[in-house]
């Protein structure tokens, strides 16, 4: 009797196996596919191919077994992506165009709180970018920690850093990824702590330092990133 029940079970499993991981006459992947890590029984992905092209939803797995990412292939050029932390919460979500990141991408902490909003064009950061102070519970308000402009993947334009009270902590300008011009740094109460110029990411010129309590200030002159000391003072 046991042998009688084994026959249909084998038949079912065999039929199922024939419905996945098939190739068309051109040798291209066709239909449902399940991929595995090399030299392993651990699943790497599940999805559907149409004449070698991924179509619809693909689920990708980490070697440890949890879901790494979910990709929805909208057409030949556009796909929506969700990436996951190992605890199952979303780590990042956004869109690809021609296999390059495009538009807004949202980055989240393991606790499911927003950390960044990045904007891409043809795979490079472009436009206004945001980084947020980490949140640890639902009662905290989401507050910007850093805001800056990008061009071609590099910081280019106004850059600002904020404290948790929402006040500007520091600000200045970047040109092609390097600090350029006067940068100003503030105490928590909003008064100036120090300010001075950069040239191609290096301190150059007179820097002023304030104690935050009086109008007194100290001045240091920098040359190529080094404090300038007159010969008479050496």
PLM regions and their residue ranges:
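Glycine/tyrosine- and acidic-biased, solvent-exposed loop/turn segments at the edges of beta-strands
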Residues: 15-234
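Bacterial Sec-dependent N-terminal signal peptides
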Residues: 1-21
């Amino acid at each position: 009797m046991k042998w009688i029940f084994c026959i249909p079970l084998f038949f079912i499993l065999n039929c199922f196996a024939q419905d996945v991981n098939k190739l068309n006459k051109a040798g291209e992947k066709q239909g449902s596919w399940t991929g595995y890590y090399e030299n392993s029984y651990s699943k790497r992905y599940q999805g559907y191919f149409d004449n070698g092209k991924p179509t619809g939803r693909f689920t990708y797995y980490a070697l440890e077994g949890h879901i790494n990412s979910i990709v929805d292939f909208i057409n030949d050029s556009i796909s929506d992506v969700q990436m996951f932390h190992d605890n199952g919460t979303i780590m990042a979500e956004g869109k690809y165009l021609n296999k390059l990141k495009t538009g807004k991408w949202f980055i989240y902490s393991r606790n499911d709180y927003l950390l960044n909003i990045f904007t891409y064009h043809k795979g490079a950061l472009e436009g206004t970018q945001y980084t947020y102070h980490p949140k640890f519970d639902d009662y905290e308000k989401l507050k910007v920690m850093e805001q800056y402009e990008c061009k071609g993947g590099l910081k280019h334009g106004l850059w600002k850093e904020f404290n948790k009270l929402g006040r500007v902590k520091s600000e200045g300008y970047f040109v092609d990824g390097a600090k350029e011009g006067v940068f100003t740094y503030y105490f928590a109460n909003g008064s100036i702590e120090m300010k001075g110029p950069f040239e191609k990411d290096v301190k150059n010129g007179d820097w002023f330092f304030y104690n935050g309590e009086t109008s007194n200030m100290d001045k240091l002159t920098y040359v190529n990133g080094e404090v300038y000391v007159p010969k008479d003072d050496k």
